[in-house]
Amino acid sequence: MTEIQDPTYSRPIDVHRWSDHPEVKALVDDLWEGYLPETITGEAGGNARTGPKPKTPFKKQLRVLILDLYVAWLDDPELSIGVSMSPNAWKTNSRYNALHLSKSLIPIIKALDAAGLLDLAKGSYAGPGARGNRTTRIRASGELQTKFREAKFIRDDVTRFEGEEIIILRDAKEANKVGKEVEYVDIAETIAMREELKAYNDLLAASFIDIATLDKPVIEVHPELEASHVHINADTARSRRVFSRSNWEMNGRFYGGWWQRVNGDWRSKIFIDDQPTIEVDFKGLHVAMLYAKAGMELKGDPYDVPLTLFQAYPPELTRKLVKQLVLTAINAKEKSSAYRAFRESFPSAHRGKE
């Protein structure tokens, strides 16, 4: 096993990975029979011998985990998955957990780690709301990576569970934090929105959206800030709608498409079904809406400020910092919270903290 050098280079576990490909089942069967103890597997059916049976059998939960480790490995062998090892964190009956993964996944992770199939960095907790808090990080070890290489299935054989929720309701968020997902009862409007968005995602799935000039389906974004990578694949070519503050009238924006996370230069190179595209660009949309509300006309780029104010910064970085500050301020309750949220969004020693 290899030590995870950077636990922050990670993403949350995706609880909706799925595949019925026979070779996927064969790999999971091999891991199940060869590495998981009888205290987990039981004598038949993949359920433990004692205690209540999980809503989703252990072996199916193992399949979801292995598939997500496989996808993360394909994206980047260094990429880790964040997973909670606290039983209380698993909400089996949540609408945001359509496959009903449960705390039963915890002993599976421990068994795979003990068998040398995972690299694992334990989670940390420094107190409520502390910035150092994080969940356990896992990724495929060298031994599991070898099994992935030998497997007779490919990335396109890994899909998403059809019942995944795509209409998301979140509560009010604290500064610099994403609001928590809120359970809700469907109404006519949410049912209609879900059907409409499902049709849109079906259209995206039936289209080939790509940047033909890329050697690999990955784009590095914001290298001058905190570099991250945008992967171009089936998972990142789909959308969900997110509403805020436990209110169906708040936000409702579309998120998920990889094209939303790259700059205009990259977007100008997008092809759909081998045909070039033209983007209708609404510059400074949020600021323009505020101007319109005040009965004023916005002229020029609202994020373009005189270089004399930021002589030490490159123009491109200056614009990105100004834009981030403005958008943070729009969503803040007061100046002090806007400044604090802006500074906290950057890593230590970053220029954005100056």
Predicted regions and their residues:
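Non-catalytic DNA-binding core/recognition domains of DNA-processing enzymes
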Residues: 52-71, 83-115
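Conserved catalytic core of nucleic-acid polymerases
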Residues: 2-59, 66-76, 102, 125, ...
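Acidic, glycine-rich two-metal-ion catalytic cores of nucleic acid-processing enzymes
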Residues: 135-318
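Minor-groove-contacting beta-hairpin "wing" of winged helix-turn-helix DNA-binding domains
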Residues: 125-139
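Short secondary-structure junctions and interdomain/linker hinges
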Residues: 115, 119, 204-221, 296-297, ...
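A short, conserved structural fragment
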Residues: 109-128
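Helical catalytic core of nucleic-acid polymerases
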Residues: 34, 47, 81-102, 258-354
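Intrinsically disordered regions, especially transient/low-confidence alpha-helical propensity segments
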Residues: 15, 29, 70, 87, ...
